[in-house]
Amino acid sequence: MSLLKIYWRAMQYLAVERTATITMCVASVLVALVTLAEPVLFGRVIQSISDKGDIFSPLLMWAALGGFNIMAAVFVARGADRLAHRRRLGVMIDSYERLITMPLAWHQKRGTSNALHTLIRATDSLFTLWLEFMRQHLTTVVALATLIPVAMTMDMRMSLVLIVLGVIYVMIGQLVMRKTKDGQAAVEKHHHKLFEHVSDTISNVSVVQSYNRIASETQALRDYAKNLENAQFPVLNWWALASGLNRMASTFSMVVVLVLGAYFVTKGQMRVGDVIAFIGFAQLMIGRLDQISAFINQTVTARAKLEEFFQMEDATADRQEPENVADLNDVKGDIVFDNVTYEFPNSGQGVYDVSFEVKPGQTVAIVGPTGAGKTTLINLLQRVFDPAAGRIMIDGTDTRTVSRRSLRHAIATVFQDAGLFNRSVEDNIRVGRANATHEEVHAAAKAAAAHDFILAKSEGYDTFVGERGSQLSGGERQRLAIARAILKDSPILVLDEATSALDVETEEKLKQAVDELSHNRTTFIIAHRLSTVRSADLVLFMDKGHLVESGSFNELAERGGRFSDLLRAGGLKLEDKQPKQPVVEGSNVMPFPVKGAVA
């Protein structure tokens, strides 16, 4: 993307506040025109002194214009600051909202810290560009576009000096941009690596401390910082060279203006006041050209991070739904997968031609080896991504024709990892339904067998649970996850084997809460333990993305197929004469002992 396109796209974010932006632009143009008039008036003051004429009138006009310029500059600075701050926060919030709608696979591939770093650095760069655009860039362009014609009307010969100076600045800027483009992109990559390392080590600080990795991780950060310096310094060298060349050109131009002016005055071809005006023009032009050079430096520096941000914005924009999309209402829970196919890009994994039907209130257990496609089915149900072929219908409605918001409102999920926020207990439960009353929150906690342990905490329901629930035990975290699902009270329930990671005693305590939660709801269980599937109305055995077997527990157990093999491998005897089989390699189903069996 060219530098001009990057700049233009950055400015488009200001269109949300069109009136305020136009006001700032008009004010900036006025400031530029007033600034341009100052050297002319100052030259007239000097000429009046030289001619011993009326000094008061031009001096008063010059002072009045200067006072207006000061007030206008304050107005522009104040308005530009406020507008730029508002838009930075606005863009950050809008982009954040789109980011958290992206599928989990997208975040896993990109990296959470990478997306966060891109967002923060890009919005900071946008803020700087917006602020400088309203404060300086626009006034600089207007001043330069007006200054040369005005100067040419006064004296063509002296104007050539200013034109040559402008050409030199442009040539130096183009040279440096060409030399630093790749280097600045490399700098941005090193910034990401450094930030990712910091984020990674801090999020795993317990491992760092436990394994005495503090010194080694700090040294690794030093190495990343050194690599960043090594990439940054060549870029800085080019800009330092540009600054020196620009300063040399501007100084030489001032000398030429003074020499030519003195020569023309002695020859009677120019007045002293006109020479003073041209000196003011030269100083003004040098200042504006320096601002342009700084602007180019800022834009080139921001180029890589803004390009990455725009790519991220384009990727997330594809997830936006039309405003008039229909909602899914009055869900009963009849679910049909009709020849559903989805394959992950460049992976060869997915689900293929999967068909089954679930009646309202039925429980479906999904089992199979790791990577079989169990979670993919659930993600398709929740429209984390849409099928490449086939369709998924809820109560006869294709899920692609309804809003994701209404679809997910109809589905409550209890993950194996509870996924708690660093907020109070009540706030975490209220994730299920934001407008729930205190009484409803407490009722959900009681139904999840969580009320007693919550009251035992020092601050009860106001107790903060720590990052990802670190201040709670595994059982306590899961009970809060179940409580928020109860509070959501959705007709469709997804259980990612919510108790499989718990000890037997804690699991038994939660079983009743889970059973109560799934009662009279269409329930999907991603099963990691065979004991979970016994009461399921429908068992789906997935392998390599295909639905290999489906039926009730007893039907599949007696069929003698893959599911039956899995039962034997887990230690369950269908018949006394059948020997115990080894565990199926790659299976996600955890064997459990049979009562009375010898281990």
Curated annotation (Swiss-Prot):
Its EC number is 7.5.2.3. Residues 21-301 form the ABC transmembrane type-1 domain. InterPro entries: AAA+_ATPase, ABC1_TM_dom, ABC1_TM_sf, ABC_transporter-like_ATP-bd, ABC_transporter-like_CS, NdvA, P-loop_NTPase, Type_1_exporter. ATP binds at residues 368-375. Its main location: membrane. It is an enzyme of class 7 (translocase). Residues 335-569 form the ABC transporter domain. SMART domains: AAA (SM00382). The keyword Nucleus does not apply. It is a multi-pass membrane protein. GO terms for molecular function: ABC-type beta-glucan transporter activity; ATP binding; ATP hydrolysis activity; ATPase-coupled lipid transmembrane transporter activity. Keywords: ATP-binding, Cell inner membrane, Cell membrane, Membrane, Nucleotide-binding, Sugar transport, Translocase, Transmembrane, Transmembrane helix, Transport. GO terms for cellular component: plasma membrane. It is found in: Cell inner membrane. The chain crosses the membrane at residues 22-42, 55-75, 156-176, 248-268, 276-296. In NdvA the ATP-binding domain (NBD) and the transmembrane domain (TMD) are fused. PANTHER family: ATP-BINDING CASSETTE SUB-FAMILY B, ATP-BINDING CASSETTE SUB-FAMILY B MEMBER 6. Belongs to the ABC transporter superfamily. Beta-(1-->2)glucan exporter (TC 3.A.1.108.1) family. Involved in beta-(1-->2)glucan export. Transmembrane domains (TMD) form a pore in the inner membrane and the ATP-binding domain (NBD) is responsible for energy generation. Homodimer. This is Beta-(1-->2)glucan export ATP-binding/permease protein NdvA. The lineage of its organism: Bacteria, Pseudomonadati, Pseudomonadota, Alphaproteobacteria, Hyphomicrobiales.
